[in-house]
């Protein structure tokens, strides 16, 4: 396993410990995905930027009140209570797109390894169609 993948895999258990994913562990795990996406090539630069931007958005919100945002779901609860959960610039949408990107990347990597003859473009197109 390459170094970026190993680093990401090492963070997954901490991110998923407990009934709700811890915010800091989840963000560290998601942040570790950025170099993995970068290693997949220039064609996926928009995904890399999107993942990095959404992680940064969530980190900035958490930094405002770290004691309030202990769980990933605390972001959603806070925005729902304030009536801000539908905002395009909010953490709820950022989290939604971050999770969609993770599903896309998981499917892309699965397809690349399943059929080494397929081009990355074909694998990315099929992954996009499957999960987005």
Regions found by a protein language model. Give the residues of each.
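Long, contiguous alpha-helical bundle segments
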Residues: 1-132
């Amino acid at each position: 396993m390459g170094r970026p993948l190993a680093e990401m895999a090492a963070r997954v258990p901490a991110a998923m410990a407990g009934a709700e994913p811890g915010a800091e562990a989840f963000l560290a795990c998601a942040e570790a995905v950025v170099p993995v996406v970068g290693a997949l090539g220039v064609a996926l630069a928009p995904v890399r930027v999107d993942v990095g931007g959404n992680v940064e958005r969530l980190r900035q919100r958490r930094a405002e009140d770290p004691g309030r945002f202990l769980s990933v779901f605390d972001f959603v609860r806070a925005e729902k209570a304030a009536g801000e959960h539908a905002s395009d610039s909010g953490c709820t949408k950022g989290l939604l797109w971050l999770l969609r990107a993770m599903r896309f990347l998981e499917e892309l990597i699965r397809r690349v390894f399943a059929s080494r003859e397929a081009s990355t473009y074909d694998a990315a197109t099929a992954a996009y169609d499957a999960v987005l």
